[in-house]
UniProtKB/Swiss-Prot annotation:
EC category: ligase
Function: Cell wall formation.
Lineage: Bacteria, Bacillati, Actinomycetota, Actinomycetes, Kitasatosporales
Catalytic reaction(s) noted: UDP-N-acetyl-alpha-D-muramate + L-alanine + ATP = UDP-N-acetyl-alpha-D-muramoyl-L-alanine + ADP + phosphate + H(+)
Gene coding for it: murC
Protein known as: UDP-N-acetylmuramate--L-alanine ligase
Entry-linked Pfam families: Mur_ligase, Mur_ligase_C, Mur_ligase_M
Similarity field: Belongs to the MurCDEF family.
Residues reported in the UniProt entry to bind ATP: G117, T118, H119, G120, K121, T122, T123
UniProt superkingdom: Bacteria
Native species: Streptomyces griseus subsp. griseus (strain JCM 4626 / CBS 651.72 / NBRC 13350 / KCC S-0626 / ISP 5235)
Amino acid sequence: MAPGIPAAMERPHFIGIGGAGMSGIAKILAQRGAKVAGSDAKESATAESLRALGATVHIGHAAGHLADDASCVVVSSAIRADNPELLRAGELAVPVVHRSDALASLMNGLRAIAVAGTHGKTTTTSMLAVALSSLGLAPSYAIGGDLEGPGTNATHGEGDIFVAEADESDRSFQKYDPEVAIVLNVELDHHANYASMDEIYDSFETFVGKIVPGGTLVVSADQPGAVELTRRVRDLSDLKVVTYGCAEDADVRVHKVTPRGLTSEVTVLLNGKFLTFTVSVPGAHYAHNAVAALAAGVALGIPAHNLASALGSYTGVKRRLQLKGEAAGVQVIDSYAHHPTEMTADLEAMRGAAADARILVVFQPHLFSRTQELGTEMGQALARADASVVLDIYPAREDPIPGITSALIIDAAKEAGAEVTAVHDQADVPAAVAGMAKSGDLVLTMGAGDVTDLGPRILDHLASGR
């Protein structure tokens, strides 16, 4: 039932094809039969998975990687103007398409669900994708992380539903025309692109305004930014607004979240009836993500009890409190949290799941601009751990900002009473953690950069007894 290949996407070339967002689009196009090619900075499991689908993936960036017959070049906001393949596209007059436009073209003609918000997008999108798949609806989906079960971040489904993570960081979420939009929260982040909360609200209002006539906005009734957004858009014509959360007036009210070890039991009140289901990750914030997914599915006309049962099929997404393993009695868990709100939520979730365990964090700040604006709050969040190791800032797409280092976070953490250590060389982290950890402890590798690679190395070091 799903559409075929958009004309401009028959022979696409992706610059940075290994990225979470780019690889998902490339996978769907390859599954639809497009001749996909691209390049990435380094070899990866993602590159191999794309090759398995028939894509050509080059390692490194060079003008010669771009085929003369490419129908378009797909880029994300992270690609610099001096990239040799992008310059070559200009010489060949090959159209350049932003990642968000490519995704929008794949969603055309389908019942789209776009999941937006400062935090929780990947988890909520994943929960929806798993639940809808479990119900036999064969959705297409594009997610910012790999699902634990299928082991992929995207797939082309034969059904008429497309679930997509909608990125607000560069305003690209304004390109979509969803039937259902989810807004989990609205906070100031991405400081290089937004100067104020007013700019954030304006951007989200534009996103909500793109919902198709008669469509539905599913929005948090608890988070202050989301509540303010609801106030601003509630009177838009031909828009249904469904709120969810603990607030007494929420349309889908969270009645109770009960921790059950590394899972949670969630009870909601919907249309005057109580409904209870299990979420296989700990923490109230993940329970609320599941309720948002439930509300979105109901907005599409799917029975709530079916969705509640199907949400139990969700087993997690990589890097979202993902258990990496255990050695010497120490569990190592990977967290993608990189904003103070996310950091606090994940630490509180782990504290609730394992109240007697010591929690040790290996934190890698993400982006100089974010550290400049939120470094103090990051340090305060780390005070919820029993001890922390803080690495140097992961720059991603940014150039350094003079005077902005991890010391901002470390100083704030110490001011808040935290036990914190700076480690500048990642090679020294496994030994540093082994020197701190004892049997029964939990170690969280936390951040949006390559800190995730340290989990297996920490486990190896612990197992060796060095």
